[in-house]
Amino acid sequence: MRIALTGTPGTGKSTVAALLPCRILDINALVKGGLNLGTDPERGCLEADMEGLERRLDELDGIGDLDNTDRVDASDITVIEGHISHYFTDSAIVFRLNPKELKKRLQARGYSEKKVRENLEAEALDAILIEAVEFCDRVDEIDTTGLSPAEVADLVVGVIQGKIRLPPGQVSWLEDFVDSGWAEG
């Protein structure tokens, strides 16, 4: 069974995925490994080969989509990790992060100011959450702000096992983002 671990870059997906007791497939590694259509000239990043990714995930996973998470053992789950992973599953857990903290993380990664702003706007506008809700039958949302990776991993396992439900719509950064000027230098 597959479940997406998705969210704006910098929200903690890779760090938390490394702590989960399930099989992890890193979508970004697959894109960097050749499942791409080349570099997008405007954005300077690799453009994912979505059809190629779907085929490769099916080959690597061989299990199918997650139809029912009630009391599922986390070890029976394949987590597809990455900010476009929700395109390949019926269920997604979307990580959210306060844009003020997100800005610090993205700058520490050496992202250009344009890329930082693009990702802050995406987070403030719920871009990944909205996509996940459109593409997935089930979506849970975790605000990772102020939580340790272990605490977030515990929440993810709880969601996977059906012990907790974290429905979307609980997190909104838009008003704070607009009022505070986080996107400005």
Q: Residues of each region from the PLM?
A:
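Walker A (P-loop) ATP-phosphate-binding motif of ABC ATPase nucleotide-binding domains
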Residues: 2
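Hydrophobic anchor at the beta1->P-loop junction of P-loop NTPases
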Residues: 5
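P-loop (Walker A) phosphate-binding loop of NTP-binding proteins
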Residues: 8
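Conserved lysine of the Walker
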Residues: 13
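Hydrophobic positions on the alpha1 helix immediately C-terminal to the Walker A/P-loop
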Residues: 16
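ATP-dependent small-molecule kinase phosphotransfer cores
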Residues: 23-87, 172-178, 182-184
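A glycine- and Lys/Arg-enriched "phosphate-lid" helix/loop adjacent to the NTP-binding pocket
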Residues: 37-39, 97-140
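NTP-dependent small-molecule kinase module
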Residues: 133-185
